[in-house]
């Protein structure tokens, strides 16, 4: 009888332990706020791919989506003069901060504010020039990057399951979600950055460089690229895309197709390129872990604008578009929690006014 009681007691303990383990196990992550690659339902999507994505090692060592891990805390920095770009001694100022993966793909608004995509919240916020915040779009399915064409058409990269590019304004509708008949998820990597042109198309990066024409038909361009940020010159004759520690360039043809791939510049300040933007003179600005790296339209390295932490994306806005904004990815506390910070700095250079970014 005693042995039976011990057996029953032991069984009850094991059952209770198993129940507690099940209760503590996190539910599978799926739905808005979860990037496709982390979604519990992604394996089912990948089973439908005619051409499956490459193994993770095939994406190369460059980070996909958020750039390099930041240092533990802020670092000392000194801004030196870059003629025509920034005066010596300028300082970065915090203008906004929020918990989670909730700031990326920033672009300017006409009134001097910025729009920012929120991954976790699946929303788009407007941060006005006075620091006031409002939600302008919701239900963006893990929106992670924004772009606006010179004609004012606003697009967002939705990074959730079955990633896609959506038009948000003037009319909300699907723009592109297939490559060679497959879901964008079959490409691999993360739907990263987007750049709209004046022809009605959108360039985007996702484990490579792609162009969705005005009808949403997608073509891939380039070889041996580890892409992240993408932008166009003010005259739209040249496309720039970050390629690890370098910046690549392509000539843009009349139909938006690309040719003449070349290494345009090395990021001499160190780190891999993430986001990018241009100013009114055609200079290119690349966000990296050391800070903002500035390159002339001829491909000459002009210098580094150091930042207190690594930055993942950037855009000109503010009065007369002479303020440079950047997004910092933070991990603070014990245990560390992710948050995002937007910082700004006064510039001599002026952002290109012909489009939002």
Where are the predicted features?
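Intrinsically disordered, low-complexity repeat segments enriched in small/polar residues
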Residues: 5, 9-12, 129
């Amino acid at each position: 009888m005693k042995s039976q009681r011990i057996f029953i007691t032991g069984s009850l303990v094991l059952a209770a332990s198993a129940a507690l383990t099940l209760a503590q196990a996190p539910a599978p992550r799926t739905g808005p706020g979860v990037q496709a690659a982390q979604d519990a339902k992604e394996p089912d999507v990948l089973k439908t791919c005619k051409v499956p994505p490459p193994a993770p090692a095939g994406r190369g060592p460059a980070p996909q989506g958020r750039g390099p891990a930041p240092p533990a805390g802020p670092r000392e920095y000194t801004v030196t003069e870059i003629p025509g770009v920034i005066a010596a001694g300028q300082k970065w100022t915090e203008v906004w901060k929020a918990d989670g993966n909730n700031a990326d793909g920033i672009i300017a608004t006409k009134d001097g504010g910025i729009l920012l995509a929120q991954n976790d919240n699946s929303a788009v916020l407007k941060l006005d020039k006075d620091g006031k915040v409002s939600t302008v779009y919701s239900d963006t399915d893990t929106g992670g990057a924004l772009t606006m064409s010179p004609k004012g058409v606003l697009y967002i990269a939705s990074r959730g399951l079955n990633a896609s590019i959506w038009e948000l304004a003037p009319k909300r509708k699907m723009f592109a979600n297939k490559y060679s008949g497959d879901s964008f998820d079959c490409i691999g990597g993360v739907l990263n950055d987007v750049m709209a042109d004046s022809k009605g198309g959108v360039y985007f990066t996702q484990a490579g460089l792609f162009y969705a024409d005005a009808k949403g038909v997608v073509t891939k361009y380039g070889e041996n690229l580890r892409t992240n940020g993408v932008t166009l010159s003010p005259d739209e004759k040249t496309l720039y895309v970050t390629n690890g520690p370098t910046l690549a360039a392509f000539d843009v043809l009349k139909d938006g197709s690309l040719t003449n791939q070349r290494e345009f510049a090395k990021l001499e300040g160190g780190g891999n390129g993430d986001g990018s933007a241009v100013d009114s003179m055609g200079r290119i600005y690349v966000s990296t872990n050391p800070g903002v790296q500035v390159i002339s339209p001829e491909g000459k390295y002009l210098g580094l604008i150091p930042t207190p932490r690594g930055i993942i994306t950037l855009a000109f806005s503010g009065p007369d578009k002479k303020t440079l904004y950047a997004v910092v990815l933070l991990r603070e506390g014990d245990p560390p929690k992710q948050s995002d910070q937007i910082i700004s700095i006064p510039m001599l250079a002026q952002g290109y006014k012909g489009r939002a970014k």
